[in-house]
Amino acid sequence: IRAKGNRLAELRDTLLGTLKPGFRELYPVRFPWLNSTQETAVNKVLCARDVSIVHGPPGTGKTTTLVEAIYETLHREPQVMVCAQSNTAVDWICEKLVDRGVPVLRIGNPTRVNDKMLSFTYERRFENHPAYPELWGIRKSIREMGGRMRRGSYEEREGMRSRMSRLRDRATELEIQINADLFDSARVIASTLVSSNHRLLNGRRFPTLFIDEAAQAL
């Protein structure tokens, strides 16, 4: 990663071990439903300024610890991003958060999302938005006018072009509105690491990123 004198450079050097990670001094939070090791790990995550790594043998509750850290972080931050190497891992975390009432927006191919999380995918939420029927109607009108333009006179075609231009502008406004509503209402944006490069996430910034199965991505 070619970066110098910025936050990306700091994170790169921290992950490579050439820069010591920073931690805040916070009063420990108690989690009676976790064991002492898990509780310590969650608090370490909450204190991290740069990066915190939770590691351990299989079956020790690392993902459970991660879910708790995410939930607690949402008491401090308006929105976080959650990623994992596999769709199964992303869905498992999302299910646990949804069960706690956390609004989740799942980014990725809906055909690879489990049935329980399907209603939380971007595509399904987009189609269920109150403004979607108007957008669908506009798109239908544009398609129909496109078909009629080939048969109309010059004056009719010019009139339809003008109307289609206005409809396209309105469609763009609705798409922007729906996207803003979906992202603004979600507390957790979730995707696989591959899908985190999705165009919908271009330009978006998150105070904290959680990655499950991080070692599998190396």
For the regions a language model picked out, list residue spans one by one.
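Alpha-helical nucleic-acid-binding subdomain
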Residues: 67-208, 218
